[in-house]
Design a protein with these regions (language model features):
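Membrane-embedded alpha-helical bundles of multi-pass transporters
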Residues: 127, 195, 215, 238-259, ...
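Conserved phosphate-coupling serine/threonine residues in phosphotransfer and NTP-handling enzymes
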Residues: 110, 117, 201-203, 286
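Conserved cytosolic headpiece of P-type ATPases
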Residues: 1-12, 29, 36, 40-44, ...
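Short, well-ordered beta-strand core segments
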Residues: 150-151, 220, 281-283, 298
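Conserved beta-strand/loop elements of the cytosolic catalytic core of P-type E1-E2 ATPases, chiefly
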Residues: 3, 34-37, 49-50, 54, ...
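Hydrophobic alpha-helical transmembrane segments
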Residues: 56-154, 176, 190, 212, ...
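Actuator/coupling domain of P-type ATPases
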Residues: 1-101, 178-179, 197, 304, ...
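Residue-level signature of catalytic and energy-coupling elements of molecular machines
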Residues: 5, 18, 33, 45, ...
């Protein structure tokens, strides 16, 4: 549970790997340590979270750019405030000028601008880790909400990737390699949000089409060579860019059009180039280390519902960041003029430097409290995402050996090209 974020225990048999610091609930076991110290799973997770916390989200660049000019601007405002009150203010002019200038310097809070994004990112990374979603950077957290297409590997990602030793080998492979729990629900939730789903597979069209229809995948690209997945990701990106260029003359963009990023979900060594090529790489935690090192997000439990959790986490994080930035900007835009005495001609009231100091401190406290609200965010698959797939969906199946597409009900084509990077 500590690693996967799931409440139910995981059964282990002889020869299975176990994770240090997890709890043995029943029975006895003899273990052999294969990774110690910084190489253990927990240490790697802690290091990954620490590295992610040290990164900056792209939205932070706006705050950094404003903060760069903020202090000089406040100094200029304070000097102008002092000069205006000395020359035009009521007696005692010097006292009023000093009070207002000092109040401006005290109430101004550049720290609020600097803290707005990092606070939300830090809490969000912790929330994700608690739910089995490990993001390697703040940028990944920001981008996940803009996913428009999710490309899945088949074996080990959508399916279990394990065949029972007592299996009937006369049966088709899709009857031996069963679909993972949660795969149908995850695909249905993505489709309910208007996100396109694609499956990349090296399997024959018959096998790939059957699995795709079972989980509700929109499009299948089958018979892909082991080193050809990155090519198909790049092709999807080119198609997206061409479509965006054609619609560039439009006057408005819908919410669906703003979701343009392509995510790749995979678990194997052959998925690593595609994970790196995709706008957002999502690795299955039960897969290879190479895949996880190439990805932007790792799903520790291997459950594809983690993709929905990632998108929900991104939405919650960006909403919280916008709230924090709105508060930071609003506080300074309102507080600085009040401290400068803009209300004095109407109310005869000047802000005390002590009250200004209290307001400055409380502004940062409010940011911390708002960021901590993320701890209560629900990032699980919700009822609004739609019901789980019924398995009656029709998928478009495209063979990597043919440039033509065929409906799943009429699958044609076989791999004939020897070049891994050509369709």
């Amino acid at each position: 549970s500590m690693i996967t974020g799931e409440s139910k225990p995981v059964s282990k048999t002889a020869g299975d790997p176990v994770t240090g610091a997890t709890v043995l609930l029943k029975g006895d076991c003899v273990m052999r340590a294969t990774q110690v110290g910084a190489d253990t799973v927990l240490s790697q997770i802690a290091a990954m979270v620490a590295r992610a916390q040290a990164t900056k989200a792209p939205v932070q660049q706006l705050a950094d750019k404003i903060a760069r000019y903020f202090v000089p601007a406040v100094m200029i405002i304070a000097i102008w405030t002092f000069a205006i009150w000395v020359s035009l203010g009521p007696a005692p002019q010097l006292a009023h000028a000093l009070v207002t200038a000092v109040s401006v310097l005290i109430i101004a809070c550049p720290c609020a601008l600097g803290l707005a994004t990092p606070l939300s990112v830090t809490v969000s990374l912790g929330l994700g880790a608690t739910n089995g979603v490990l993001a390697t950077s703040a940028k990944a957290l920001e981008q996940a909400r803009r996913i428009g297409t999710v490309v899945f590997d088949k074996t080990g990602t959508i399916t279990r990737g394990v065949v029972d030793a007592a299996a009937d080998w006369d049966k088709p492979s899709y009857e031996q390699d069963t679909v993972k729990e949660g795969s149908r629900e995850a695909v249905a939730a993505l489709r309910a949000r208007g996100i396109r789903t694609v499956m990349l597979s090296g399997d024959k069209a018959e096998v790939a089409g059957r699995i795709a229809r079972e989980v509700g995948i929109d499009t299948v690209i089958c018979e892909v060579k082991p080193d050809g997945k990155a090519y198909w990701i790049a092709k999807l990106q080119r198609e997206r860019d061409e479509a965006a260029a054609k619609s560039a003359y439009g006057t408005s963009r819908t919410a669906a059009q703003s979701r343009t990023l392509i995510a790749m979900v995979g678990d194997g060594i052959n998925d690593a180039p595609a994970l790196a090529q995709a706008d957002l790489g999502i690795a299955i935690g039960t897969g290879t280390d190479v895949a996880m090192q190439s990805a932007d997000v790792t799903l520790m439990s291997g459950d594809l519902r983690g993709v929905i959790k990632t998108i929900n986490l991104s939405n919650a994080t960006m909403r919280n960041i916008r709230e924090n930035l709105g508060w930071a900007f609003g506080y300074n835009v309102i507080g600085i003029p009040v401290a400068a005495g803009v209300l004095y001609p109407f109310t005869g009231w000047l802000l005390s430097p002590m009250i200004a100091g209290l307001a400055m401190a409380l502004s940062s406290v409010c940011l911390v409290l708002n960021a901590n609200r993320l701890h209560g965010a629900n990032i699980n698959v919700g009822a609004a995402d739609g019901p789980a797939g019924s398995g009656s969906s029709t998928a478009d199946v495209e063979s990597a050996g043919s440039a033509e597409s065929a409906n799943a009900a009429n699958i044609t084509g076989s791999a004939t090209s020897n070049a891994p990077h050509e369709p």
